UniProtKB/Swiss-Prot annotation:
Protein keywords: Ribonucleoprotein, Ribosomal protein, RNA-binding, rRNA-binding
UniProt keyword Transferase, yes or no: no
PANTHER family per UniProt: 50S RIBOSOMAL PROTEIN L15 (PTHR12934), LARGE RIBOSOMAL SUBUNIT PROTEIN UL15M (PTHR12934:SF11)
GO biological process: translation
Species this chain originates from: Lactiplantibacillus plantarum (strain ATCC BAA-793 / NCIMB 8826 / WCFS1)
Database matches in HAMAP family: Ribosomal_uL15 (MF_01341)
Molecular function GO labels: rRNA binding; structural constituent of ribosome
An example Gene Ontology CC term for this record: cytosolic large ribosomal subunit
InterPro entries noted in UniProt: Ribosomal_uL15 (IPR030878), Ribosomal_uL15/eL18 (IPR021131), Ribosomal_uL15/eL18_sf (IPR036227), Ribosomal_uL15_bac-type (IPR005749), Ribosomal_uL15_CS (IPR001196)
Entry's family note: Belongs to the universal ribosomal protein uL15 family.
Pfam family, one: Ribosomal_L27A
Subunit (UniProt): Part of the 50S ribosomal subunit.
Entry function: Binds to the 23S rRNA.
Protein name: Large ribosomal subunit protein uL15
Recorded name of the encoding gene: rplO
């Protein structure tokens, strides 16, 4: 077998349908849209259900968006193990390490085990995270 002898497997390639190019093309006259009616004419907008009350209006409105909500990037204790012993961990260093996407507000949670003595600076800490960091000989600082 040579490169010029390679052919695509049967049924894997289709030529595009040239719609509305004469009756003998098989896609002429009504172009696969059937006879008359709404669907044979222009477009029907997304979500339109033919006059029936659409789903997005049948479902009740719920809740609201709290404008004072603060989003925190979450970091767990096992993620802090990648820093050197005695290092100072800040939101900027967490971003450089790839643990958070933005160096904004960070909350440290207590999942996993911390094996190193670190000084951790973050916006918030869970009680278990503070206990684990201090048990490892480190310090926590709310910024």
């Amino acid at each position: 077998m040579k490169l010029h002898e390679l052919t695509p497997s049967e049924g894997s390639r289709f030529s595009r349908r040239r719609i509305g190019r004469g009756d003998s093309s098989g896609q002429g006259k009504t172009s696969g849209r059937g006879q008359k009616g709404q669907k044979a004419r222009g477009k029907v907008r997304v979500g339109f259900e033919g006059g029936q009350m659409p789903l997005y209006r049948r479902i009740p409105k719920r809740g609201f968006t709290n404008i004072n909500r603060k989003e925190y990037a979450v970091v767990n204790l096992d993620g802090l193990n990648r820093f050197d012993d005695g290092a100072e961990v800040t939101p900027e260093s967490l971003k450089e390490a790839g643990l958070v996407k933005k160096s904004s507000a960070v909350k440290v949670l207590g999942n996993g085990k911390l094996n190193k003595k670190l000084t951790v600076k973050a916006s918030k800490f869970s009680a278990t995270a503070v206990a684990a960091i201090e048990a490892a000989g480190g310090k926590t600082e709310v910024i």
